[in-house]
Curated annotation (Swiss-Prot):
Gene source species: Arabidopsis thaliana
Residue ranges with Polar residues bias: 1-15
Amino acid composition bias (Basic and acidic residues), ranges on this chain: 285-294, 600-635
Name of the molecule in the record: Oxysterol-binding protein-related protein 2B
Tissue expr: Expressed in roots, leaves, stems and flowers.
PROSITE patterns cross-referenced by the UniProt entry: PH_DOMAIN
Gene: ORP2B
Function in brief: May be involved in the transport of sterols.
Amino acid sequence: MPLTRSKSLPATENGGSDRETLQSGRSVAGILYKWTNYGKGWRSRWFLLRDGILSYSKIRRPENVNLLSPSDDLRLIGDISTDRLLRMKSCSGRSRRKHHKNIGIVHLKVSSYRESKSDHRKFYIFTATKTLHLRTDSRSDRAAWLQALASTRGIVPLQSINGDFSFVSPKDLSISTERLKKRLFEEGMNESLVKECEQIVDSEFCEVQEQIKLLHEERKKLLDALRQLEMANLEAEASGIHDDVYQLRNHKYSSLGRGKYSECSTSASSDDKQEFEDISEEDEASFHDTKESFGEPDVGSVLTHFKRRTKLPDPAEKERGVSLWSMIKDNVGKDLTRVCLPVYFNEPISSLQKCFEDLEYSYLLDQAYEYGKSGKSLLRALNVAAFAVSGYASTEGRHCKPFNPLLGETYEADFPEKGIRFFSEKVSHHPTVIACHCEGKGWKFWGDTNLRSKFWGRSIQLEPVGILTLEFDDGEIFQWSKVTTTIYNILLGKLYCDHHGIMKIRGNRQYSCMLKFKEQSILDRNPHQVNGFVEDVTGKKAATVFGKWNDSLYYVAGDGINKASASLLWKATKAPPNVTRYNFTSFAMTLNELIPGLEEKLPPTDSRLRPDQRHLENGEYEKANEEKQRLERRQRMSRQIQESGWRPRWFEPQGESESYKYTGGYWEARDVKSWDDCPNIFGEFTEEVADCA
């Protein structure tokens, strides 16, 4: 195969070079440095540009370098690429070369690029799902790569490298008939005939120009369609990559009643996993996980024929970022209890709704109920453990805080397609306590949560206080408490959260479970790990559990020595295509939705009716900030209201345990719209409201 090194290109500052190089159509390859994460920084990768597709792979071993076939004309960019390739070829014969494995691909026809203004070696490639941060060894190498990108048909430069690459608009086309007129006069034709010929040419050109205009519009539509299809097809196109990265060699994983399963993220590094997730987003509009519909309406709801939304409303205003430092500076010396954080730091759901988000994978409890009915108690306990872990999956990438509910604020969720009804209420303001109750097919779930926070300068540690209870109709009960959550890089760096600690799931019959959420370190290549076991009443391990709280969970019978026979318990749903800065899951996007006919059934205390939260969801940021300040002034009266003898409407305290239990009656009151004893807590505050409460 003819390998040539890219010579020092006669490039201008903005990357121009000779036209022959751009139009040669040769494959381009070389070593680029790719930014991975803060722990590992810049890592060298082997990049190959061919047929409009940019692929990259690790280069630890010679077999990781793709040289295509001997007939391909490959142009290498950079001295380091040539030197390293020759050195690797001398160390390993061609016969040892194995099948090439990419760890990332980029379809350039639906991508764009931009060179860095601050560093002459850096440039960026933008796709619908990610941004590649790349760096070369020199200015000339960057110019060569940018020329190669520009020569790829259809790529759109964000900062034009050379004006010749843009598509010529039909209105800029023109035609000159001077040569034609001159030639006709030379043939002896008279002026009237020449003028007639000129008119014919102009007429034909106008028709051609109109056709070009139509083709131009069609081209734009096709490019838009390609960009939309890209997100839907990336996972299918990269399925081979997915298997290569995540499949444990020679392991065959089987899921519970779902056939063979060949993916296991526990073997992949955080870098590999991130690279794959960036290029393979799943285009799935379904928000629920129950694969089988219930045969009868066990929870008292009839399935309504409507489609829940798959995206948030388009913002009505352009959001303006907020500097945390400037906000701290502006509030130095002020009473912090009266400082109102702007809605920029909030996501458009409340903590009440976030409680319901933990039930996104409620089908696990349905499965647990069925397993228990058929005498498979171990599988019931395993599914309960998977459910306890699954509630953390939605926290990945969520950088905004939910709204703090007002005292007495409520939230209902009637999801007949999932077979569940959920209700929650803020039952105390000092301390803040949220109680919830949920009914499913053959099970009930309830609990209350109070967060104790500790500020450590660069991080905030949240320790949940409260017990969650799951009771099946046959009397089997499981109880557990949530683990500690720590939010890192509050002031500087990339904000992220981690969950860590021991979760003990206690059963009142044969099995209990213990899970350890491993705390993530700065250089951890395999974060979010969960490991544990299920034991019987004698203390003997019945099954071993392992996986990641943001991705999947597996189990192996016994002590877990033979992980090759592991079975899938739970797999997180892929991120939706219509992501916003809130990083909502498809399920989370439905939580604050006012479906047709729902508003007139809700009590005036429901979170969906909270004005600042609704304005934020609609992108009306100024109104949202105004309403948030108004409601927080009202919130400061909550202690006085609570101390005056206020009691929650739908929950009652259980003795000295400081826990709350649902008293019943909400759904019955909803059926007859009996909300006379529910004050309008979101309205204008008056002393009468306090007396009423």
